[in-house]
């Protein structure tokens, strides 16, 4: 559980990080996101995230995340990590629809919602694909954010439809592109 919280905390510390103009190695909804954030890049922990050119890492509508992490306590098991993320989402956001886990032959995909209330509140849909590699547990994340103020019945239906498409899209990404992007140079 500490590993999951660590991964989420790392993603939230974007404000203290740096960004460069390097395009995402994979597309989300047919688009390459050109602004890159490079987080920790060690032998066992690596993070790169991407947003649109006109957005910031504090305020974005689409995000692509690439990660490599070591999870020896679960033997770098992708399905177990997806189950752990789903359990964490259920605990933190019990009033949201339940997470959706889809096992795959080489890993697992999990989709869940998160939100932040308040003046700048938002709803966020996250889709993670996990697989085991020689260096540890890899993940690819597609996330979308919408202001809570814009959420009505139609927007909620649109979000649900987009999630189905993102789950299918992330399952078809060539994972070698992610692994190559996370290689230490």
Task: Go through each PLM region and give its residues.
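Mid-chain, structured segments of secreted extracytoplasmic proteins
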Residues: 62-104
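Cleaved targeting-peptide boundary
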Residues: 20-27
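Bacterial N-terminal signal peptides that target proteins for export
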Residues: 1-11
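Secretory pathway targeting signatures of secreted, lumenal, and periplasmic proteins
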Residues: 31-73
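Short, hydrophobic/aromatic-rich segments at coil-to-beta transitions
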Residues: 47, 105-112
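Short secondary-structure junctions
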Residues: 27-43, 91-103
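Short, well-structured beta-strand
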Residues: 112-184
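N-terminal signal peptide c-region/cleavage motif recognized by signal peptidases
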Residues: 16-17
């Amino acid at each position: 559980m500490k590993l999951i919280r660590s991964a989420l905390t790392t993603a939230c510390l974007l404000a203290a990080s740096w960004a460069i103009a390097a395009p995402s190695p994979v597309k989300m909804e047919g688009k390459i996101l050109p602004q890159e954030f490079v987080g920790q890049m060690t032998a066992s922990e690596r993070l790169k995230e991407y947003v649109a050119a006109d957005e910031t890492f504090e305020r974005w509508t689409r995000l692509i995340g690439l990660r490599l992490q070591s999870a020896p306590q679960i033997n770098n098991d992708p399905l177990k990590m997806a189950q752990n993320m789903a359990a964490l989402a259920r605990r933190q956001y019990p009033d949201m629809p339940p997470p959706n886990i889809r096992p795959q032959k080489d890993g697992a995909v999990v989709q869940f919602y998160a939100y932040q209330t308040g003046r700048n509140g938002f709803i966020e849909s996250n889709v993670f694909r996990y697989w085991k590699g020689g260096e540890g547990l890899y993940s690819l994340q597609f996330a979308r954010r919408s202001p809570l103020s814009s959420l009505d019945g139609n927007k909620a239906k649109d979000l649900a439809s987009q999630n189905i498409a993102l789950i299918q899209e992330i399952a078809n990404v060539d994972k070698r592109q992610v692994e190559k992007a996370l290689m230490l140079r």
